Amino acid sequence: MALYLVQHGRARPKSEDPLQGLSEEGAADVRRIAEVAAHYRVRVSVIWHSGKKRGAQTAEILSAALRPPKGVRQIDGINPMDDAVAFARTARVDQDEMIVGHLPFLERLMAYLVVGRSDLPIFRMQNGGIVCLDHYPKTTRPVIRWALMPHVG
């Protein structure tokens, strides 16, 4: 089963929006990435988010393009400073699922899942980007299968 990790889109500064919802550019980046993912027939059963405004907005934009049967849901344990190892040990992914979250949590979760250590950066995420983790034959840990990022360079 694939696990799609998504960093929320670019947010407004706290001075403009205390809840830090998506900026216009951030929402546009997420829409563009969502359209590409839909074109490539990315299918997920559910899209999870942290409950933070920018995460929920990102999840809703992705949901409009990907139409997950179980919709968009909030989940605890994926906020920026939450324990990625604890989350990974308790999470059960039995279908293709997407998690919309925050840094540094997402990069720590990815590192733990792929190499078994959350303190070793293995991929630099971008706001609005998607990383697909999937199992590779004869391995016990997932690998990075592909990534879609709003910006190159």
Model regions and ranges:
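Active-site-adjacent alpha-helix immediately C-terminal to a catalytic or transition-state-stabilizing loop
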Residues: 85-141
